[in-house]
């Protein structure tokens, strides 16, 4: 997955930025940014399938690839 995929959609960008800032709860990110929870979870699944995110217990955590993308996007 590349940064263009994340940046091409405003909801993906918001959720990715929330996860990159250390938040581990998708529902909390969705509520904060007024995103429909179902949409937020669908985006999280896209990130998991793309290898950027992993789910540990009930928390979502960026993978090493996700951390590299975060650094690249924030430049």
Task: Outline where the language-model segments fall.
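Basic, amphipathic "hinge/linker" alpha-helix immediately C-terminal to the N-terminal HTH DNA-binding motif
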Residues: 59-73
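Alpha-helical hairpin
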Residues: 7-8, 35, 62
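Short amphipathic alpha-helical interaction segments
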Residues: 34-48
């Amino acid at each position: 997955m590349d940064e263009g995929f994340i940046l091409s959609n405003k909801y993906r960008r918001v959720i990715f930025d929330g996860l990159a800032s250390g938040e581990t709860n998708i529902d909390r990110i969705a509520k904060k940014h007024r995103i429909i929870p179902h949409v937020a979870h669908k985006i999280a699944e896209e990130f998991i399938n793309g290898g950027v995110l992993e789910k540990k217990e009930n928390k979502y955590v960026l993978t090493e690839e996700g951390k590299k993308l975060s650094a690249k996007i924030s430049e």
